[in-house]
């Protein structure tokens, strides 16, 4: 057919419910020109399902950002693209032009709106091995993530953060090459896939955010122990470096979307989405009213002096200790990423279309580590220290006609760690983020022991498709 329309939906433990629609015209104006119109909406039902059952919880954080409700609002994307095959009368060439608008979220990190256009030249090097060069012009505005700017760049007053949240241009040039030599698209049993990207944004590309970014990933599949038993391995590497700010940004600020994050259903599965790597904690100042300073003096939680409060010794009005659950962890991401996984997939003989999996995921996120893009090269030990983890786990797959429906349980062996804490005060009639001088000894697993404490170390992931 010359026309095709599709509509679908689904859910997972991070994005709640989603729906998507697509319309394709395969011969627009003749010459096999292809027009694609797509739209998707996610985060549906988030307010009602927040923290219910298998779904992730967005904490009701009332500190500076006040953005807990923002993370529960729907996300959406819409795009239109026209693709010209055999461009310049070369059968391996294609040129596409498109426009888009979106409200995207990096879960628990940042929300941003954007709109713009893109131009892409694609050259097919071999079967299932395309290379492309693209330019994407986007006007973006960060909606949430005040603590990100405060801790990462020292910008803590809400007036300056407001300026950073104004519309900025994010306009990179991206070169990409990929190859697919796997035997099946949805559940490979043999072969390999690989992808590499180089990205640059600067004044030359008319971008306010300026950086160099490199990323590569690959997966290898081999049958082991039987026809439907597969050993799958996966590796991800990434580096990004800011190049300085424009007149609008006036700082070496990376867009949060261009930093690297780890943790989640397709990453290190012992952690929730983006929760492995550098993090901070946010805490409403009201919980610091009954705190003390490092010297034991009463804490002043209403002024700049709140920075001297000790977040490890706080109580409520009834003098009961305030637990770790009152602190909200927020991922900062990093400029360097290394991640590796090994997974053994096997059939369950007595249950048709059902399979099991055993896996080990490892990853680390850091700053300027093993840096091929700039100065400040550090060691692998620096990358792993404090920001890395290895998490084992197991899972079940139901092999449906639309792909594997996957349930994974990842075990988190991490212990308590020292994390920076930020809160907010009203200063001269304006809200201001204040980083505390004393870090918090924090454990996302809680302080409980026994069976309950052990079970708290498991992270559940439910999604469609293999992890890689």
What are these regions (language model features)?
Residues 2, 14-16, 32, 75, ...:
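Short, solvent-exposed loop/turn segments at the edges of secondary structure
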Residues 2-3, 27-33, 86-93, 125-129, ...:
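Secondary-structure transition/capping motifs at alpha-helix termini
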Residues 3-24, 42-45, 52-54, 133-388, ...:
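C-terminal outer-membrane beta-barrel translocator/porin domains of Gram-negative envelope proteins
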Residues 6-11, 18-87, 93-101, 118-120:
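Predominantly transmembrane beta-strands of Gram-negative outer membrane beta-barrel pores used
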Residues 36, 270, 276, 399-401, ...:
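Residues at secondary-structure transition points
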Residues 63-167:
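Transmembrane beta-barrel wall of Gram-negative outer-membrane proteins
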């Amino acid at each position: 057919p010359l026309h095709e329309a599709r509509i679908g939906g689904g859910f997972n433990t991070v994005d709640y419910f989603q729906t998507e629609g697509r319309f394709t015209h395969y011969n627009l104006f003749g010459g096999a020109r292809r027009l694609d119109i797509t739209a998707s909406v996610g985060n549906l039902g988030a307010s009602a399902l927040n923290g219910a059952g298998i779904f992730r919880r967005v904490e009701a954080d009332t500190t500076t950002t006040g953005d807990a409700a923002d993370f529960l609002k729907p996300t959406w994307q819409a795009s239109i693209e026209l693709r010209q095959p055999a461009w310049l009368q070369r059968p391996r060439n294609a040129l596409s032009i498109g426009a888009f608008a979106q409200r995207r979220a990096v879960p628990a990190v940042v929300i941003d709106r954007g709109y713009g256009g893109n131009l892409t030249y694609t050259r097919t090097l071999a079967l299932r091995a395309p290379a492309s060069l693209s330019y994407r012009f986007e006007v973006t505005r960060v909606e949430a993530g005040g603590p990100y700017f405060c801790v990462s760049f020292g910008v803590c007053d809400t007036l300056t953060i407001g300026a950073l949240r104004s519309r900025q241009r994010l306009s990179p040039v991206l070169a990409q090459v990929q190859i697919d030599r796997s035997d099946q698209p949805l559940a490979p049993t043999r072969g390999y896939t690989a992808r590499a990207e180089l990205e640059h944004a600067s004044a030359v590309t008319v971008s306010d955010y300026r950086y160099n970014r490199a990323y590569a990933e690959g997966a290898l599949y081999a049958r082991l122990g039987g026809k439907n038993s597969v050993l799958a391995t996966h590796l991800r590497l990434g580096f990004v470096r800011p190049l300085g700010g424009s007149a609008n940004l006036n700082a070496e600020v990376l867009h949060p979307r261009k930093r690297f994050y780890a943790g989640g259903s397709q990453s290190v599965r012992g952690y929730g989405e983006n929760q492995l790597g550098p993090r901070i904690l946010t805490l409403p100042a009201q919980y610091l009213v009954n705190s003390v300073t490092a010297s034991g003096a009463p804490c002043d939680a209403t002024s700049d002096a709140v920075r001297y409060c000790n977040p490890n010794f706080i109580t409520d009005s009834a003098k009961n200790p305030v637990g770790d659950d009152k602190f909200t962890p927020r991922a900062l991401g990093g400029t360097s990423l290394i991640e590796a996984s090994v997974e053994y997939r096997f059939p369950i003989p007595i249950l048709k279309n059902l399979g099991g999996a055993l896996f080990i995921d490892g990853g680390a996120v850091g700053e300027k580590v093993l840096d091929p893009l700039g100065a400040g090269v550090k060691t692998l030990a620096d990358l792993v220290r404090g920001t890395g983890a290895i998490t084992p786990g197991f899972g079940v797959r139901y092999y449906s006609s639309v792909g594997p429906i996957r349930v994974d349980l990842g075990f988190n062996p991490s212990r308590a760690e020292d994390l920076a804490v930020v809160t907010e005060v009203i200063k001269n009639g304006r809200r201001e983020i204040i980083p505390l001088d004393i870090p918090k000894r924090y454990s996302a697993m809680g302080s409980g022991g026994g069976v309950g404490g052990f079970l708290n170390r498991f992270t559940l992931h439910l999604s469609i498709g293999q992890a890689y």
